[in-house]
Amino acid sequence: MAGRELSHLQQLEAESIQIIREVAAEFDNPVMLYSIGKDSSVMLHLARKAFYPGKIPFPLLHVDTGWKFKEMIAFRDAQAKKFGFELLTHINPEGLAQGINPFDHGSAKHTDIMKTQGLKQALNQYGFDAAFGGARRDEEKSRAKERVYSFRDRHHRWDPKNQRPELWRTYNGAVNKGESIRVFPLSNWTELDIWQYIYQENIELVPLYFAAKRQVVERGGQLIMADDERMKLAEGEQIKEEVVRFRTLGCYPLTAAMHSEADSLEKIIEEMLLTRSSERQGRLIDSDQSASMEQKKRQGYF
């Protein structure tokens, strides 16, 4: 009798769990980067499955910037309490002292100091030799050519010309002292796969992903949510109420909402089947300049 064939989502799940287990067994001090978004929520769910009924054997790290949506931080803390995983948080103390923010210093400087440099500080502080990330190859062209095991030098820099072959799902995790690996268990997933898996597994998400009435400002053709009193308005701008949701999450001044009536997982999946635009069109940091994501990754970004 032939064995039961795995569904598409089951194959992706099995591949990701195998990667997570292999890293946990192979590296001395791994960590899972937790950005609180939908991909991080799926990756956390997979990690819990990988080691069930035991606890996740490595910590989760959130690199905060001080500008995340309030609902993201509340969700992060609630998830840590619910599932009992070890949660580490880090915010760049120098950037905090200088008052670095996306309004006064721009997206490029804010992202470099508060995210890239903040991440490198945390990785150095704890001595992590492998860091899981939730990036997928369908998101953006620089990520499309990145390996599952993404080698980083002692300065956490990525060189796209210095990558290792990954034939037949065989991964080379050998690193010298001070070097590290970024690991992407969701590399072969698509945005639609993520949403269908969330629906199948009933995974909790930040409410911002679902359409609701929210206070937004139209700026440069994008809808920016006024999440707190720090929101700075340009001359002529007005806050208005619109029914919107977010396809991707980050710092609220740098993350655009979209008009949508999708207030349930079923409606979001239906919307995904019809959309032809990139989910990262709402990430203002990606529009700094041509190939900006690859340049950020070369400097140590996620």
UniProtKB/Swiss-Prot annotation:
Q: Which UniProt keywords apply?
A: ATP-binding, Nucleotide-binding, Nucleotidyltransferase, Transferase
Pathway(s) it belongs to = Sulfur metabolism; hydrogen sulfide biosynthesis; sulfite from sulfate: step 1/3
Any one GO MF annotation of this record: ATP binding
Q: Which reaction does it catalyse?
A: sulfate + ATP + H(+) = adenosine 5'-phosphosulfate + diphosphate
User: Which example biological process does GO assign this protein?
Assistant: sulfate assimilation
Q: Where is this region: Disordered?
A: 280-302
Q: Pfam families, alphabetically?
A: PAPS_reduct (PF01507)
Q: Which domain of life is it from?
A: Bacteria
In terms of SUPFAM superfamilies, this protein maps to: Adenine nucleotide alpha hydrolases-like
- Top enzyme class, one word, equals transferase
Q: Which InterPro entries match?
A: PAPS_reduct_dom, Rossmann-like_a/b/a_fold, SO4_adenylTrfase_ssu, Sulfate_adenylyltrnsfr_sub2
Under Enzyme Commission nomenclature, its number is 2.7.7.4
**NCBIfam families given for it?**
CysD (TIGR02039), PRK05253.1 (NF003587), PRK12563.1 (NF009214)
**Family of the protein in this entry:** Belongs to the PAPS reductase family. CysD subfamily.
Entry function = With CysN forms the ATP sulfurylase (ATPS) that catalyzes the adenylation of sulfate producing adenosine 5'-phosphosulfate (APS) and diphosphate, the first enzymatic step in sulfur assimilation pathway. APS synthesis involves the formation of a high-energy phosphoric-sulfuric acid anhydride bond driven by GTP hydrolysis by CysN coupled to ATP hydrolysis by CysD.
User: Subunit arrangement?
Assistant: Heterodimer composed of CysD, the smaller subunit, and CysN.
Q: Please report the name of this protein according to its UniProt entry.
A: Sulfate adenylyltransferase subunit 2
Query: What species was this sequence derived from?
Result: Shewanella baltica (strain OS195)
